[in-house]
C-alpha cells in the first residue's frame, strides 16, 4: 500500500494541483481567443475547494471570484482560511444549507439566461472553479500518471503492471480523473470509491440505485459531505454513450 501525497500545495489541499494551474490556463485561453470581458468565477465549496480557488485566482487580471460555503459546513480552519484570503478580486459568502444547496444554487445561476444576458451587458462572463468545469479535471489526470511513474522509478512495479487506486470521493471528480487516465492507457486495475457516512456513491456503485433523498451527515471530512455528485453524470455519459440519456439521468440525481 502506498500513499500519494497531494497536500504539498499552498493551501494543503489536493485541489491546489488543479487550481494553481487553472487560472493561468484561463488567462492564456482568453488571450488566444481575443476575449477581453471580465470573467466571474463562481465556486461552491464545503471547504478546501474554496480556499484553493481563492488562492489560485486572487489578483489574476480580468478575473473576479466569489465563493459560497454552507454555514457550519466547513471546518473552522477552512472557514478562517477563506475569510482571511487577501486579494482585490475575491469575495466569500456563507449560505444557509449544506454543500448541495450551495452547488445547486451556483448551477442555477449558470443555467439562467436572464442573468447571462444582464452580465453580458456589463461585459462579464461566468465560469467556475468547481469540477463541473472540465479545466479542473485535466490537471488531476496527470498525477495518476505521476504516481505510476514514481512506483516505476522506485522499482515497486514493472512497466505494464496494473495499479489499483483508492480515492476518497465526494463530487466524483478526482476518481473520474483516474477513470480518464485509465481510458488514456494508464495500467489502472481497480478504482475504489471511498466514502464517509454520506455514502451515496458507494451505494450507487454497489446497488445501481442512486438515492440522494436521504439523511445528510456533517462529518470530520466535509469535502466528502455531498449527496448530489456532479461528475457522476460524466461517467453515465460514457456508460450510456448518449448525451441526452446521461443528461436526463444526471438531472434525476437530485
Name every feature range the model reports, one short phrase each.
Residues 1-254:
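PLP-dependent amino-acid enzyme catalytic core
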Amino acid at each position: 500500500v502506498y500513499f500519494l501525497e497531494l497536500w504539498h500545495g499552498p493551501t494543503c489541499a489536493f485541489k491546489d494541483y488543479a487550481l494553481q494551474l487553472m487560472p493561468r490556463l484561463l488567462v492564456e485561453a482568453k488571450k488566444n481567443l481575443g476575449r477581453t470581458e471580465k470573467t466571474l468565477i463562481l465556486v461552491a465549496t464545503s471547504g478546501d475547494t474554496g480556499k484553493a480557488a481563492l488562492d489560485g485566482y486572487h489578483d489574476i487580471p480580468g478575473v473576479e471570484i466569489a465563493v459560497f460555503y454552507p454555514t457550519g459546513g466547513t471546518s473552522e480552519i477552512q472557514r478562517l482560511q477563506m475569510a482571511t484570503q487577501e486579494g482585490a478580486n475575491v469575495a466569500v459568502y456563507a449560505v444557509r444549507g449544506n454543500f448541495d444547496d450551495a452547488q445547486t444554487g451556483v448551477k442555477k445561476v449558470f443555467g439562467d439566461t436572464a442573468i447571462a444576458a444582464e452580465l453580458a451587458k456589463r461585459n462579464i462572463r461566468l465560469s467556475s472553479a468547481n469540477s463541473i468545469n472540465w479545466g479542473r479535471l485535466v490537471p488531476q489526470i496527470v498525477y495518476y500518471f505521476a504516481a505510476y511513474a514514481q512506483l516505476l522509478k522506485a522499482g515497486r512495479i514493472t512497466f505494464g503492471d496494473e495499479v489499483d487506486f483508492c480515492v476518497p470521493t465526494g463530487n466524483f471528480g478526482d476518481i473520474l480523473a483516474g477513470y480518464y487516465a485509465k481510458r488514456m492507457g494508464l495500467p489502472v486495475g481497480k478504482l475504489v470509491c471511498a466514502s464517509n457516512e454520506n455514502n451515496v456513491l458507494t451505494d450507487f456503485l454497489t446497488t445501481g440505485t442512486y438515492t440522494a433523498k436521504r439523511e445528510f451527515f456533517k462529518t470530520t471530512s466535509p469535502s466528502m459531505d455531498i449527496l448530489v455528485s456532479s461528475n457522476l453524470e460524466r461517467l453515465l455519459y460514457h456508460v450510456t454513450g448518449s448525451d441526452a440519456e446521461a443528461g436526463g439521468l444526471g438531472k434525476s440525481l437530485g
